[in-house]
A protein has these predicted regions:
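Extracytoplasmic gate region of multi-pass secondary transporters
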Residues: 43, 249-299, 390
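Cytoplasmic membrane-interface "Motif A"-like loop-to-helix N-cap segments
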Residues: 91-102, 312-323
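Glycine-rich segments within core transmembrane alpha-helices of 12-TM secondary carriers
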Residues: 162-186, 381-393
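C-terminal transmembrane helical hairpin of 12-TM major facilitator-type secondary transporters
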Residues: 316-361
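Hydrophobic core of transmembrane alpha-helices in multi-pass small-molecule transporters
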Residues: 122-141, 342-357
Length: 437
């Protein structure tokens, strides 16, 4: 790889975030929140969409299978889109990718809200739905790495963990907004009214807000880091992804493991929890969902807290701390489900939810990749683990919960062990010789 000056890789340390940093963070977080909002409403409304976009004689179960298949195609397309967009982002600029990814999410989301149904156009309806979903997936694969990279190159190096922790918390807020929007629709309207046209509202709303955010992002500047490497003719001329694999394999694999912990923690502690609470504690759907909503809020706080700790302690120590706290809380929660009072379980669950954000220390990893290949490095880290491992957690946890009350604890314990080992390896290999930036 071409030699480049390390001074072009990060911005100098300084105290606090400046006003411009906060503006950048706000626009980055807004885009991320909207993308995950769009992602969630499709997942949650799949049973309804299956009735509208497939023939009635197909049968409800098969229609739902096909709708979820369209949703799953997103997981396959996500790494492809993310890696292509990252390649362009390392060659053409961060700001351009940062804006394009949001535009590619907003337009198909708006289009979904305006699509004709099977009753109107026949087989064209599911084909159009599939096309929208594929474009969405390409966008979401590019958005998160582009946002992490853009923000990391706009804020001082000693604030990168906090900034990307705030950004990752924004993704959790998007999941929360998507869930609350769908719940509100189901509470306010009858099933017939939703099928008659109300289902379009969250898609149109998400699309319009996304286009507004695109317009706002247009006013952001290119990062000073990218401008510096471009002016000094340090842009990588080969295939950035190949250089990531050749020279930064350890960073890539450790980052993939941390991202797995982050995704799997959300799946186990947040997404799979309502069903477990209803089965084991006899909670109503409303009570279980309330725990879930509070859990998502705490996970967002955890992203910010552990992101800041990554600035202070380094990624390695932060990962080890998160793993120990998560395992302790999970052990109390799962083994105390049928014995402890609800107050004690709530406290253990709150700590689990907070620690589900500890994987957000991944945001600090961005500055470990050299600037000319940085976006490709983060896109590979995020998308490869999301594609290979992201869909594994929910079905595995559902199966484990059927085997034993504490079934999901086994998966969490294995994840915590992996997270702690990765933290220890990272600390010894990358952080032992120098103070965390």
């Amino acid at each position: 790889m071409q030699h480049h000056n390390a001074n072009t890789d990060v911005l100098p340390a300084r105290q606090g975030l400046a006003r411009q940093d906060i503006k950048v963070l706000g626009l980055a977080s807004l885009g991320g929140a909207l993308e995950f909002y769009d992602f969630m409403i499709f997942a949650l409304m799949a049973p309804l969409l299956s009735q509208l976009f497939f023939p009635a004689d197909l049968g409800g179960a098969w229609a739902l299978v096909y709708t979820y298949a369209i949703f799953a195609i997103g997981y396959v397309m996500r790494p492809v889109g993310g890696l292509v967009m990252a390649h362009l982002g390392d060659r053409l600029g961060r700001k351009r990718m940062f804006t394009w990814s949001l535009l590619l999410m907003a337009m198909p989301t708006l289009a979904m809200g305006l699509l004709p149904m099977y009753a109107q156009v026949g087989v064209l309806a599911p084909i159009l739905l599939l096309l929208c979903r594929v474009v969405q997936a390409v966008a979401i694969g590019g958005e998160v790495p582009a946002a992490w990279t853009y923000v990391s190159e706009q804020v001082p190096v000693n604030q990168v963990g906090l900034a990307n922790g705030l950004l990752t918390a924004g993704l959790s807020v998007g999941i929360l907004l998507g869930s609350v929007t769908v719940l509100a629709l189901q509470a306010a309207f009858s099933n017939d009214a939703i099928l008659a046209g109300v289902w379009r509202v969250p898609f149109v709303l998400g699309g319009v807000l996304g286009l507004l955010a695109v317009w706002m992002r247009k006013h952001l500047q290119e990062t000073p880091i990218f401008m510096a490497i471009k002016q000094r003719r340090l842009l990588y001329q080969g295939l950035p992804l190949a250089e990531v694999w050749r020279s930064h394999k350890a960073l890539l694999l450790i980052g993939m493991g941390i991202n797995w912990f982050l995704l799997a923690s959300v799946a186990v502690v947040l997404l799979a929890m309502p069903k477990l609470l209803q089965q084991q504690l006899g909670m109503s759907a409303v009570q279980a969902t309330t725990w879930q909503v509070l859990g998502i809020a705490l996970q967002a706080m955890g992203c910010i807290t552990f992101g800041r700790l990554a600035d202070k302690l380094g990624i390695g120590r932060t990962a080890m701390l998160g793993a120990v706290l998560m395992l302790s809380a999970a052990t109390v929660f799962y083994f105390g489900l049928q014995a402890l009072p609800v107050t004690a379980l709530a406290m253990a669950y709150a700590l689990m939810a907070l620690c589900a954000g500890s994987g957000a220390c991944l945001g600090k990893l961005v500055v470990r990749f050299p600037a000319p290949i940085r976006l490709s490095g983060m896109a590979a880290t995020y998308n490869l683990s999301s594609a290979l491992l992201g869909g594994l957690s929910l079905p595995l946890v559902a199966w484990l919960n059927l085997q034993a009350v504490w079934g999901a604890w086994l998966y969490l314990a294995a994840l915590c062990a992996m997270f702690a080992v990765l933290g220890w390896v990272f600390q010894k290999r990358f952080e032992a010789a120098c103070k965390p930036q």
